[in-house]
């Protein structure tokens, strides 16, 4: 069944195994990088800088300020700060706190074609 059809006709519910719900190191690294990176972008205020691109499109500075009111700027910058904090919390989980956390074990293919557990 295709993924699109699965939205309208979902498969029956099933119990997930522990291995399926465990966190993995690559997932943790990617979520940390995304959170810190995008949070830094939002917190820096760069999305609200009037530049050549807006001037070229014919948007004046006053029109640009109308499209980005102060409450919107503060909200997104605050959300950026929260994303940065979440990224650091997520990134330090497992080695600074919650040290007994278990991660998924991946099997990789060795040179001779046999699978090995990491």
UniProtKB/Swiss-Prot annotation:
The keyword Iron does not apply. It is found in: Mitochondrion. Coiled coil: none annotated. Keywords: Mitochondrion. GO terms for cellular component: mitochondrion; peroxisome. It comes from the Eukaryota. InterPro entries: Mitochondrial_unc_protein. To S.pombe tam6. Present with 752 molecules/cell in log phase SD medium. This is Uncharacterized protein YDL157C, mitochondrial. It comes from Saccharomyces cerevisiae (strain ATCC 204508 / S288c) (Baker's yeast).
């Amino acid at each position: 069944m295709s993924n699109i059809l699965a939205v309208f006709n979902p498969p029956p519910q099933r119990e997930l195994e522990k291995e399926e719900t465990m966190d993995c190191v690559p997932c943790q690294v990617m979520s940390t990088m995304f959170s810190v990176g995008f949070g830094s972008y939002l917190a820096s205020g760069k999305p609200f800088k009037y530049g050549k691109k807006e001037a070229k499109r014919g948007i004046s500075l006053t029109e640009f300020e109308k499209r980005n009111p102060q409450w919107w700027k503060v909200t997104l910058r605050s959300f950026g700060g929260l994303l940065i904090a979440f990224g650091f919390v997520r990134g330090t989980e497992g080695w600074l706190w919650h040290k007994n956390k278990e991660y998924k074990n991946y099997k990789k293919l060795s040179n001779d074609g046999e699978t090995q557990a990491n």
